[in-house]
Amino acid sequence: MNYSSKKTSGRISMVVKQYEVGNFAVFCYLIGDEETQEGLFIDPADDAKGLLSEAKSHGLNKIKYIVNTHSHVDHIMGNAEMVKKTGAKIIIHEEDAAALVRTPPYLLEMFGATASPPADIQVKEGEIIQVGNVKLKVLHTPGHSPGGMSLHLDGMVFTGDTLFVGSVGRTDFPGSSWDVLENSIRKKLYVLPGETVVFPGHNYGSSPTSTIQYEKRHNPFVRG
């Protein structure tokens, strides 16, 4: 676990936890409302048993959603097991929904992965994903994939493979685009307040989190 926070705002007692899971340095996030005991996972790529144990230790006994920031296999390979254990509904951006269930068999074999069930809910820009009284706003941030999305929550943004600490997502995959990715970062992420904490989709940087202000000043790929 790299980041741990509990925040009380009004009636909301919010849990935010960061975990590095699997063999590909994927960051998974547990977010929930202690009062209602509802939670969700962002990109639970591996170790469903361990993640659920963590959720219960923080009083989150009902995992309502699995939110995928995009459809690439390293982020969705834990979906099937998590759905089996929790009955949680899968959420993904509408432009990545088809790709979620079309992972090539050779990639599944290469990653030792099980195919994901289809999405239960498809979202788009500006929609709200809610667990208890905790609300995450969908930011469509394509470029790494057509339906890549980030999630904005109370001074935090979960950026998937759009923006990393000191780096950005690859754009050499089918459906990727450097111009689109750069536009997403500039128009959707760099417009957020500078103190907004960046929670990336992989542990690729010098630290597990960053801020919008830091990335605008120091990210060598996209300067603000």
Where are these regions (language model features)?
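Conserved beta-strand hairpin/beta-sheet module of binuclear metal-dependent hydrolase folds
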Residues: 11-58, 150-160
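Short, glycine/acidic-enriched loop or turn micro-motifs at the edges of active sites
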Residues: 35-36, 46, 73, 96, ...
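Short acidic-hydrophobic surface loop/beta-edge motif
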Residues: 5-9, 19, 31, 127-131
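Hydrophobic residues at beta-strand termini and immediately following loops
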Residues: 19, 123, 212
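Metallo-beta-lactamase
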Residues: 105-107, 128, 135-224
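Conserved S/T- and glycine-rich ATP-binding loop of Class I adenylate-forming
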Residues: 31, 69, 141
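Structured loop/turn residues at beta-strand edges in well-structured enzyme cores
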Residues: 12, 58-61, 132-134, 194
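Active-site HxH/HxHxD metal-binding segment of metal-dependent hydrolases
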Residues: 39, 46-131, 217-221
